Amino acid sequence: MRNWRQAENIRLYIAVGCGAAIGALLRFLSGWVIVAILGANPLWGTSFVNIVGSFIIMFFATLTGPEGRWLVSPALRQFVMGGLCGGLTTFSSMSLDTFLLVLHGNAAFALAYLCGLVFLSLSAAMLGLIAAQRINR
């Protein structure tokens, strides 16, 4: 029994690690594309990945949760939610961006950026919930 649990834990670790690697690569590439399209301001890339990641994690969590239609393995659930979304989103970059704005004398903009990003990320999560609930019906 113990060996089975260890093997299952190893599967979860590998799933999270692979998902995180893909999520981090997607974060880097999407940031690069967003900056190329909208300009050199890194706030756009950070905002984009956090908003999209919030939608994805809530959408997937709702579809694969106890009331969800999709039955997936714990490894796949951790791959998407812990790995992919964890690697894609970036709280640390948001914190760095906010503090850099404050340090450069843009405290009001920093507050607006922080509040706006939290609001938009939570709104995206709500949209993910609503979309998945419609599929679950």
From Swiss-Prot:
<keyword id="KW-0406">Ion transport</keyword>
<keyword id="KW-0813">Transport</keyword>
<keyword id="KW-0407">Ion channel</keyword>
<dbReference type="GO" id="GO:0140114">
    <property type="term" value="P:cellular detoxification of fluoride"/>
</dbReference>
<keyword id="KW-0472">Membrane</keyword>
<feature type="binding site">
    <location>
        <position position="86"/>
    </location>
    <ligand>
        <name>Na(+)</name>
    </ligand>
</feature>
<dbReference type="InterPro" id="IPR003691">
    <property type="entry name" value="FluC"/>
</dbReference>
<dbReference type="GO" id="GO:0046872">
    <property type="term" value="F:metal ion binding"/>
</dbReference>
<feature type="transmembrane region" description="Helical">
    <location>
        <begin position="110"/>
        <end position="130"/>
    </location>
</feature>
<feature type="transmembrane region" description="Helical">
    <location>
        <begin position="43"/>
        <end position="63"/>
    </location>
</feature>
<keyword id="KW-0479">Metal-binding</keyword>
<comment type="similarity">
    <text>Belongs to the fluoride channel Fluc/FEX (TC 1.A.43) family.</text>
</comment>
<protein>
    <recommendedName>
        <fullName>Fluoride-specific ion channel FluC 3</fullName>
    </recommendedName>
</protein>
<keyword id="KW-0997">Cell inner membrane</keyword>
<feature type="transmembrane region" description="Helical">
    <location>
        <begin position="83"/>
        <end position="103"/>
    </location>
</feature>
<feature type="transmembrane region" description="Helical">
    <location>
        <begin position="20"/>
        <end position="40"/>
    </location>
</feature>
<dbReference type="GO" id="GO:0062054">
    <property type="term" value="F:fluoride channel activity"/>
</dbReference>
<comment type="function">
    <text>Fluoride-specific ion channel. Important for reducing fluoride concentration in the cell, thus reducing its toxicity.</text>
</comment>
<keyword id="KW-1133">Transmembrane helix</keyword>
<keyword id="KW-1003">Cell membrane</keyword>
<dbReference type="GO" id="GO:0005886">
    <property type="term" value="C:plasma membrane"/>
</dbReference>
<keyword id="KW-0915">Sodium</keyword>
<keyword id="KW-0812">Transmembrane</keyword>
<dbReference type="Pfam" id="PF02537">
    <property type="entry name" value="CRCB"/>
</dbReference>
<feature type="binding site">
    <location>
        <position position="89"/>
    </location>
    <ligand>
        <name>Na(+)</name>
    </ligand>
</feature>
